[in-house]
A protein has these predicted regions:
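Extracellular beta-sheet/turn segments enriched in Thr/Pro/Gly and aliphatic residues
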Residues: 22-25, 113-150, 161-162, 280-285
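A short, solvent-exposed loop/turn motif at the edges and junctions
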Residues: 86-118, 124, 128-130
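Bacterial Sec-dependent N-terminal signal peptides
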Residues: 2-50
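Short amphipathic beta-strand segments in non-cytosolic proteins
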Residues: 52-64, 185-197
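Short, acidic Ser/Thr/Gly-rich low-complexity loop/linker segments typical of extracellular
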Residues: 61-79
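Internal, hydrophobic beta-strand segments that form the core of beta-sheet-rich folds
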Residues: 96-97, 230-264
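Short beta-strand elements
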Residues: 250-285
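Short Pro-Gly-centered beta-turn/loop motif in secreted/extracellular proteins
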Residues: 74-94, 100, 231-235
Length: 285
């Protein structure tokens, strides 16, 4: 019996130690991470402005996340003792910060023996970026829906104004339209539930196609109308999102794959496309 209790308490001590650290250290094993903050150009600091939705991707590490509304983010690194995740190979890794209508920002971090290599300029030993990541805007987009609030008995068209601001002298985009001798007829709207990515209605014209168009500085206004009665939208709050993809050659193929295949399609996959936009509220009472 004495030997039994000796073995039992020996096992208990070993089990507790393993829960703390496999090498009987003082610190508990926890998920390692890289943290930081992002500030968007032409957006006020939080809480006056929102910096959420920035796509953060660590190239070569296979991890990604998005920023919270205050611009903060956390990339969870694989645990050092988790063989299923694979070891982090020694070397430098690039963290990409992406929005479709902002310039890509990058931070390079280094790993050695599976650990973050800290330095005085980039990252702390705890994995916190020492500087705020700033992202410069390529173009802005604000959507105005008229009327914004639909009451009982309304049976007219809903008008959507899309104001595009081009920060460089020229930006090329892809959008849905019909080209005629008299000009262009624009279409291509997603109407989704405001509190989810559930698609409620698509505004489209059968003969419209996705076409490339240049947006000269200072910008352009697009007008799109659709028949409210045919939408059959139920009571609720919605967000109206114009289909628009910024034409750019600086996006790595791996970054596109990390976002999700088909993000540039005119369907619900478009909701995967990280893009900073404002407005678009539609309330049906």
């Amino acid at each position: 019996m004495k030997n039994y209790w000796s073995y039992f308490f020996g096992f208990l001590v070993f089990f507790v130690a393993c829960e703390e650290n496999p090498f009987f250290g003082d610190d508990k094993i926890s998920n390692r991470s890289i943290t930081g903050n992002v500030k968007l150009d032409k957006v006020e600091y939080y809480p006056d402005g929102y910096h959420g939705g920035v796509f953060v991707w660590a190239e070569g590490l296979g991890i990604k996340t998005t920023t919270d509304i205050d611009g903060s983010f956390e990339l969870i690194l694989p645990a050092a003792n988790d063989p299923s995740m694979g070891a982090i190979v020694n070397g430098e890794y690039t963290i990409h910060f992406f929005l479709g209508n902002y310039q890509i920002s990058k931070v390079i971090v280094e790993f050695a023996a599976g650990q973050i290599v800290s330095d005085d300029n980039t990252i702390t030993p705890e994995g916190e970026l020492r500087k705020i990541v700033y992202m410069m805007r390529l173009m802005g987009m604000h959507t105005t829906v008229s009327p914004e609030i639909i009451t009982a008995g309304f049976d007219s068209n809903i008008k959507v104004d899309v104001d595009i601001a081009s920060d460089p002298s020229e930006v090329f985009v892809y959008l849905k339209k019909i080209s005629t001798r008299d000009g262009s007829i624009y279409t291509g709207l997603f109407i989704k539930e405001a509190d989810s990515n559930k698609l409620a209605y698509l505004v489209d014209i059968d003969s419209a196609i996705i076409m490339r168009e240049d947006i000269m500085s200072p910008g352009k206004n697009l007008e799109i109308e659709f028949d409210y009665a045919s939408s059959n939208l139920s009571s609720g709050t919605y967000e109206v999102i114009p289909y628009l993809i910024v034409d750019r050659s600086d996006v790595p193929e791996g970054l596109k794959q990390a976002i999700g295949l088909g993000f540039d399609s005119f369907n619900q996959n478009y909701f995967q496309y990280p893009f900073k936009r404002t407005g678009g509220k539609l309330v049906i009472q």
